[in-house]
Amino acid sequence: MQSARRHLNTIFILDFGSQYTYVLAKQVRKLFVYCEVLPWNISVQCLKERAPLGIILSGGPHSVYENKAPHLDPEIYKLGIPILAICYGMQLMARDFGGTVSPGVGEFGYTPIHLYPCELFKHIVDCESLDTEIRMSHRDHVTTIPEGFNVIASTSQCSISGIENTKQRLYGLQFHPEVSDSTPTGNKILETFVQEICSAPTLWNPLYIQQDLVSKIQDTVIEVFDEVAQSLDVQWLAQGTIYSDVIESSRSGHASEVIKSHHNVGGLPKNLKLKLVEPLRYLFKDEVRILGEALGLSSYLLDRHPFPGPGLTIRVIGEILPEYLAILRRADLIFIEELRKAKLYDKISQAFALFLPIKSVSVKGDCRSYGYTIALRAVESTDFMTGRWAYLPCDVLSSCSSRIINEIPEVSRVVYDISDKPPATIEWE
């Protein structure tokens, strides 16, 4: 059986640094098509050898006219492989074929857009054009299109929001179809490109590698057992690294700016004597849970809220002291207890408390005092790359605040974080 890394019928995503690359990869896999994220500077020879069915160019934080901006090898366009270019990728494609890109009025967040009938939109736009809403995140604009391309989308601020060259099977979108919670038509656009234009068969399922993973784990356990039987020296280090950890940590060769530095990616010394085992490294969180269910793990384990590998230390903002951690543990326990009491714990994706080393004035027992601040954070998300703050009932928040302030003397104030991701991240550090 082939490993996931050499899976056939693959879509490649060339990463130019977009923080939505993780989301994009996951949306393609949700279409039951295997995809991999690769650095933008991958060689043409490697692409020829791997023979992907399609290529997606991600967005990125750069401008195509910057001196050190990442650029695609023009020979890639000559491979005859369908290409969907998103945001920065579209600007790059337009420029590479003779179009122009210039700074313009920025568009961020929800944006009304006009979609025109075309091959990419054929399942959402019939004979007439369609007005809908999409997710934008750009400042630069394609100002003139290359010869052989047509405009397929426009907004009030960006007249060229989508382009296509059906003869060469090249498509560009200034918006982000992968952010499906804010782009209702995005999944259908990706489905059309992946399954119809690229003719990718819907064969991918994380359960297909279950037998292979179990076999490898069994072999590893036997090998470790044999070695331990001969010596008490430790030989192995097992890590629960998943694919989102790898992508978010912006590994070498990728253009992505580091947003999260995961403790289990790139942090091990090169001369490490232990042998590293990472059986889940190329699976997303949801795919790991699917495997867990197939392996018979309990829902108590599979549905627990994520907890950071470094522990509570990243939820103490600033200097980390034992007394700060003690306060945070008590506050977090109260918060989770109240959520479970209100039967809300299983309805939200993640919830936790944070310790802020900020003292503010309060009145306790007719006396003036100063105490620390506790922030409460609860989010709803399907992939943890984007998310919305959870709308908790006021009576639940009131109960949490009252208990924390009354049961933890060092705390005088409780606040609730109502920031979405993006722009905020789920964890504060």
UniProtKB/Swiss-Prot annotation:
GO terms for cellular component: cytosol. It catalyses: XMP + L-glutamine + ATP + H2O = GMP + L-glutamate + AMP + diphosphate + 2 H(+). PROSITE patterns: GATASE_TYPE_1, GMPS_ATP_PPASE. Residues 10-118 form the Glutamine amidotransferase type-1 domain. Pfam families: GATase, GMP_synt_C. Residues 119-304 form the GMPS ATP-PPase domain. SUPFAM superfamilies: Adenine nucleotide alpha hydrolases-like, Class I glutamine amidotransferase-like, GMP synthetase C-terminal dimerisation domain. InterPro entries: Class_I_gatase-like (IPR029062), GATASE (IPR017926), GMP_synth_C (IPR001674), GMP_synth_GATase (IPR004739), GMPS_ATP_PPase_dom (IPR025777), Rossmann-like_a/b/a_fold (IPR014729). Its EC number is 6.3.5.2. GO terms for molecular function: ATP binding; GMP synthase activity. It is an enzyme of class 6 (ligase). Keywords: ATP-binding, Glutamine amidotransferase, GMP biosynthesis, Ligase, Nucleotide-binding, Purine biosynthesis. The active site is at C87, H176, E178. Pathway: Purine metabolism; GMP biosynthesis; GMP from XMP (L-Gln route): step 1/1. Catalyzes the synthesis of GMP from XMP. Homodimer. This is Putative GMP synthase [glutamine-hydrolyzing]. It comes from Chlamydia pneumoniae (Chlamydophila pneumoniae).
